Amino acid sequence: MAGLFLCIFLILAAVLFTKKKSTDIFTMAEASKMLAYAATDFKTSETDDTGKYWYSGYVNAVSEAGLLKIKKPEAKVRFKDTYALAKKLEVPETVLAELQNSAKAMTKQEFLDVFMQLLPYMQNGEQVVKMQAGIAGTPATLKQAGEWEAYTTKGTYRFTGIVLDDKIDKTVTIYTCGKEILAVEDTVENLVEYKNIWIKSSTDTTVETNVYGADRIFKIPGLTAPVENVLADLKVENGSVTQINTKTDTITGMVQAVTKDYVEVQGYGKVALDDAFMIYDIYNGFAVKTYQDIIVGYSLQDFIVAEGKICGAVISKPLNVQNIRVILKNTGFKSIFHENVRLTCSKSFMVSTNEQQTRYNAGDVFELTPDNELLLQGRVTVTPDNGGEISILSVMRSQGVPSYEGSIELAAADDGIVIVNDVPVESYLKRVVPSEMPASFAVEALKVQAVCARSYAYKHLENGAYSEYGAHVDDSTMYQVYNNTSEQSSSNEAIQNTRGQILTYNGEVVQTYYYSTSCGVTTDVSIWGSDSSSYPYFVSRFVSRSQKELDLTDEAAFEAFITSKDENDYDAGYALYRWELQADITALSNSFNAKLYEKYLSAPSKILTQQADGSFQSQKITDIGTITSVTVNERAAGGAVKSVTVCGSAATVRIDSESCIRGLFGMTDAEMTTNTGTTKMASLPSTFCIFKPVYEKGSLSGYRIIGGGYGHGIGMSQNAVNEMVKDTMNYQQILQFFYPGTAIEQK
């Protein structure tokens, strides 16, 4: 029996595992690909126009970095080449001593072993991952696959220059960096399990499936029962389907929070996601989604569970917007985390968890601290009786203690308690519109704000930025200011008269950016580094009764524009239509340096330091010394500054961010002259500005920063809207002015 068992085991091993004898040479081209990603600044896009061979970009990157001496890309890699590579990487002597330094050619596996040994010393070494993956298909077998694109059990990857067609329906060991497969080991397991795929339909001999986003038909001789519209695991062995395990157990409920690790479902709490979790949208045709597409506050999908985890989700309902979920920041809008929460209600209210409910009378105070045992039971929900409003006593706003319609949810987080207000969208708008636009403005102007605010809210329902905490937006200027000012009759009238109206472009909801005051012109999204052609409804135009023909990206033209005023500009009568900040060089330098490191930490890719060779790189910077010059590198459409270079006595930095430029040049203690008086601001009102050096006795003594407008300058100027209404424009005309090509849709 023992001999028989051994024989069977050996046969099975031979069937399931095949290994090509690893005597094939490993070429410089193949090695270059791995090193380009792991040890240079190479980017995938560089392969596009670098030559007629797939390896040209990789070879160029590695050669320029001096990592390998490559005469012929097809030449074999020798042990002495990897030894020289190790010395170039400055590995410790102890590591170097373990490497061979011979002219012998390396097999693939020998190179891969050395590569992994040297990986900790490569600049992108932490991004390289070695893992096992099943190969579901390539362009040779999948119509959805693009050039050099492989669908695997670990996701979709590019595999430029690698042969994968013979690995389909097999499990292999791959080396990846980002979304690129760098290499594949020769060892192959002739068995693969495709977990949580979608079976669309079947016949007696086939099943039509969607495997991780790609359609595939598998042959299954003798299928005894039809299988359709179901989640399943499918095993393939030696090229044949050997097993189908369908999954039909489901849970449903409102989604209260979503992360990459779990979904919090009302009534079930936090349920872990399976490692191979998949989500399929079968309502809008058919599409594969990710956990980031799950919308909190709604129940649009059925969750399929097995062994205590969510394996998949099927979206089968449309999003009919009713409520929005808003994180309430603490006093001063400093943080989303609260040290404690005290609240009461104008009517009786219920405090509930998944395990218990407690009723309180109107006026009773409920208090919660992070260590309260209620939070161990999950999310705590506070629900008022009909018509009741919840007052958060532990938070102060401009109006005093704020009160809220809808329900309040309290959730534990590492840094405190998160408060979420689940409220009808139209009720939300009643406390957004007067917080964003003065209620003293004409009702027609408030209608414009109402449509913009509603559109903004609809757009953010699907963005998922706060899904981890179970919300869509927060109540600060990061989104729309909510309930900083109590609701007003004029804004309520505007909201009611535009009820359900949103702004769309080609049927898609528009991200309706707006700001306080223009300088007489708007800009587009290129100021934020976005592609302006993707947002055709954000254009640069003069916010004026008279249009001009000026190229304000030209420095001289913009200076002439910003140092003059035009009474035809709709914002001409407002304080920040024009402004000027004058500062001596010492005060300006001190203020700039005091904020520099904080700004660098918030946007390290946008604050770059000049190197000895003149190039700019992202690196820690805390002080540039005394400012010696400020140079505008680029202006966006309309003249807003996109990039400046600031030279100092100790260092030179380039700032490629509108918000960082505003923050770094603002001076809390310096008076700013405005159109109507003076003020002090921690940030520049906008980057529609020029930097004029001031000299005394031939030496730089300070700067005059002359500018106009308040805000980013994209989309609608709120103050201009009020003036347009005075000119008898209606809200529809105003929306077309600021968002050309859009349409108002009724939801």
Feature locations, PLM:
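Short, solvent-exposed alpha-helical surface patches in non-cytosolic proteins
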Residues: K20-K43, G51-L67, K71-P120
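Conserved, single-site charged/polar hotspot
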Residues: A2-S22, T40-E46, G66-L67, V91, ...
